[in-house]
Amino acid sequence: MDAQTKVIIIDYGSQVTQLIARRVREAGVYSEIHPCIVTAEQVRAMKPAAIILSGGPASVGEKDAPALEKGLLDLGVPVLGICYGMQLLGQDLGGELATSETREYGPADLTLTAPCPLWDGLDLGTTSRVWMSHGDKVKTPPPGFKVVGRTATLEVAAMADEARRIYAVQFHPEVHHSEDGARIINNFLFHVAKLKADWTMSSFVERAVKEMAEVVGDRHVVCALSGGIDSTVVAVLLHKAIGKQLHCIFVDNGVLRLNEGQEVVDYLREHFDLNLKYVQAQERFLSKLHGVDDPEQKRKIIGYTFIEVFDEEAKALGHVDFLAQGTLYPDVIESVSHKGPSAVIKSHHNVGGLPEKMNLKLIEPLRELFKDEVRKVAAELGLPDFIIWRHPFPGPGLAIRVIGEITEERLDILRRADKVVQQELMSSGWYRKVWQGFAVLLPLKTVGVMGDGRTYEHVIALRIVDSVDAMTADWARLPSELLERISSRIINEVKGVNRVVYDISSKPPSTIEWE
C-alpha cells in the first residue's frame, strides 16, 4: 500500500478500534490498525499520511498502562487522539490529568466552544450529541493547546494544537451514537491532513490482480469454495489473475441447504469459466455423523472430514503450490492483540488445519478488507445479488440446525422448511433488512390436529436476527402477517411438521445459532 494514502491507527485496546478504520475507509482513505507496541521507526517506514490514537480500557496513570510511543509525534504528520488517545497526549505533552468523579459512559451533549478545523460545517456555540466512555479526563490542556469543546461534566472535551496539527477528543466520533462523528473524522482527514480519497474497490481489484499474478507466476493455486461470498470473491479475483492455474474444489458435505451446492457451482462455471471440481461426499460425511447428537462432536467430525476430503482432492491435482483462503482484515487484527504478539487472542485459520497439513504457501487476497468492502468488491467483479447478500451460513451447515441426531429424513424436513423462510424473507423485502434468518429443527414432536385426525409431528423454530457484526444480535421484529405466512406455509407444505415457533432471544445471552 506504499503508493496509496494511508492512515495508521494505533490500537490501545478499545472495543471499537475497528470502527475507526471502517469510518476512515468509508471516507475513501486506506487505513491500517497496529498494536500500541509498534515503534515510531516502524510507523515511519509505513509512510503514514496521518495517525489516529484509539481509545482503550486502561487508566493512563496505571503502572502497566499502554504508553505513547516516543517519536510518534515527531513524524510530522497530523495526529488525532480519541478518548485514551487524548489522555496520552495530555499527559505526554505536559497537561494535567484527573480521574473523573464517576466513570462516564453513554451520550453527552458536546458544546463547540472555539473555532477548529474538526468543526468545519458545524455551527460554533451549538451542541452535538456524542458518545462517551471514560474514567480519566484532561483537566488542563498541554502548552500550545486550546480547548475547543466541552460538555456539562467535562471542561476539556476536545482540544487542538493547530500549529502542530495535533487534535484530541474525549468522545468516540467513530460510533454511530456520535451524530456528527463521521463529519468530524472526515474533517480531520481532508481539512487537517489534506488527504485525497483514493481508496476504492476498483483500485483494490486492479492492484490485487496484479500482485497475485506476480506472486503466483506460473505456479498453481487450490481454493476451497463454500458458496459464501468470501471464498467466491477469492476465486473470481484469482481467476482474473491466473486463469486456469487456479483449481477450485467444492465439497458437498451433505448438510447444505436445498440445491445450494449445484446452484453455486453451475453459476460459477457458466459465468466465470472456473476450473472447478464438485466433490459429492455426502455419504462419507453423513455416515460419520450417524448417531451423533453432540454439537461439538458434529463440528469436529465435519471439520476433520472436510480436511481429509480436500487434502485428497488437492493431492490428486499433483502440482499445487498455494492454498487460497478468504481471510478478512478483522481476522488479521484479532490474531494480534493491542498488547502485541505475546497476548494472542486467537490464531486464525479460515480453513482450520489445512495450511499446516498440506505444506502449502498461503495466499489471502482479502486480508486487507472488511466484510462490507468484500461485498463492494463482489459487485465490482459482477457477482449477482444472491451471492453478494447471502446470509452467513455456518461451516458445519445444517448439522447444527438439526438439533440432535442427523438423518436424511430430518435434513429433508429442515431443508424444505428453510426454503420457505428464505423465499418469504426475499419476497417481502426483509431478506436484506435482517442479518440472518433460518429454520431450526427441534428434537421433539408435538400433538396437532389436521382435518379430522390427530397428528404427532416435528417442530420448526424460526431464528431471524438483526445485527451489524454478529458480536451482538437482537431478534427481528417481523410483521405478524409475515410470520403467520411463514408458519402457515411450512405446516402446509412441509410434510412432518405441525408446529412453528419464533425465537425471541437476543445475543447475549443466547447465541445466533442454536448449537
Curated annotation (Swiss-Prot):
Key words, A-Z: ATP-binding, Glutamine amidotransferase, GMP biosynthesis, Ligase, Nucleotide-binding, Purine biosynthesis
Annotated S-S bridges: none
Residue span, Glutamine amidotransferase type-1 domain: 6-198
InterPro entries on file: Class_I_gatase-like (IPR029062), GATASE (IPR017926), GMP_synth_C (IPR001674), GMP_synth_GATase (IPR004739), GMP_synthase (IPR022955), GMPS_ATP_PPase_dom (IPR025777), PAPS_reduct_dom (IPR002500), Rossmann-like_a/b/a_fold (IPR014729)
Functional pathway: Purine metabolism; GMP biosynthesis; GMP from XMP (L-Gln route): step 1/1
Record EC number: 6.3.5.2
Active site: C83, H172, E174
Any GO molecular function: ATP binding
Membrane-spanning ranges: none
Main enzyme class: ligase
Keyword DNA-binding: no
GO cellular component, one term: cytosol
Reactions accelerated catalytically: XMP + L-glutamine + ATP + H2O = GMP + L-glutamate + AMP + diphosphate + 2 H(+)
Keyword Nucleotide-binding: yes
All copies of domain GMPS ATP-PPase, residue ranges: 199-390
Top-level division of the source organism's lineage: Bacteria
Function noted in UniProt: Catalyzes the synthesis of GMP from XMP.
Subunit (UniProt): Homodimer.
NCBIfam families: guaA_Cterm, guaA_Nterm, PRK00074.1
Name by which UniProt lists this protein: GMP synthase [glutamine-hydrolyzing]
Gene that specifies this protein: guaA
